[in-house]
A protein has these predicted regions:
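C-terminal helical "lid" of AAA+/P-loop NTPase domains
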Residues: 1-5
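Peripheral, non-AAA+ core regions of ATP-driven protein-machinery
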Residues: 9-23, 28-48, 53-235
Length: 235
């Protein structure tokens, strides 16, 4: 930075740096972070997951799913630079989502997407395709988006959720809850689902922000089982 390279300036204290200096001089060649707003309508196969990083930043991660023609029924196509743990979570989510459909729903899906001359798999895409993503905390969201696609039920757009998932449908503990929620509020989320196992973290969050306008009108729901998530999220 110029201010560090110029010895005649660095010896003068205090140093005054304005917001205008930061935007138009020192970081003029840097891209400004733009918070993408969530969708304004309920949709099938679209859910707001959540993310957080080690720097304390967080926000929403749109996760979308659609059927696509392929050689193997319900084969998964994964795009969006998911790393190994997240990809494994997607396979767990698919097994769970399929197991939760009724026999009647399974038959309808197979009659349409698993015929002799036409088979379909599921394409799952996570937003911000150029950014690597990993971790198991999107499991509940991925299960929900797959169940939505399989059953044709829409997902409420104002919700975001986080939580690891297992094959028995248990929603389990994650990290970075406060960063995920604060960033997602900026993106327009007004309702959150988080793991019951994170209740201590949630209480700490509420103690810190209970008098802050940032959480005015925001609803929070703990969940321990994926069915609780479905009951809240699905139209």
């Amino acid at each position: 930075m110029d201010i560090l390279k110029n010895g005649t300036i660095i010896d003068q204290f205090p140093i005054d740096i304005t917001i205008d200096d930061i935007k138009n001089k020192y970081f003029k060649d840097k891209q400004e972070v733009v918070i993408k707003q969530i969708s304004k309508e309920d949709q099938v196969g679209v859910v707001n997951g959540m993310w957080a990083n080690m720097m304390g930043h967080g926000g929403t991660l749109p996760i979308k799913a659609k059927f696509f023609p392929c050689d193997k029924f319900l084969d998964l196509k994964l795009t969006g630079l998911q790393e190994q743990v997240m990809r494994e979570s997607m396979h767990v989510a698919e097994t769970l989502a399929w197991s939760l459909t009724t026999d009647e729903e399974k038959k309808k899906i197979q009659d349409k997407y698993d015929t002799a001359d036409h088979k379909s798999g599921i394409h799952i895409h996570t937003g911000d395709g150029s950014v690597k993503k990993d971790g198991p905390s999107g499991g509940a969201a991925i299960t929900t988006v797959l169940y939505s696609l399989l059953t044709g039920r829409k997902i409420k757009h104002e919700f975001a959720l986080t939580g690891e998932i297992d094959l028995h449908g248990e929603v389990t503990k994650i990290g970075g809850l406060d960063s995920k929620m604060l960033g997602s509020i900026k993106a327009g989320v007004t309702s959150f689902i988080y793991p019951k196992e994170n209740e201590k973290d949630f209480k700490t969050f509420m103690e810190k922000y209970k008098d802050d306008k940032v959480i005015e009108g925001i609803s929070f729901y703990p969940a321990g089982q994926i069915q609780e998530v479905f009951d809240l999220l699905l139209v």
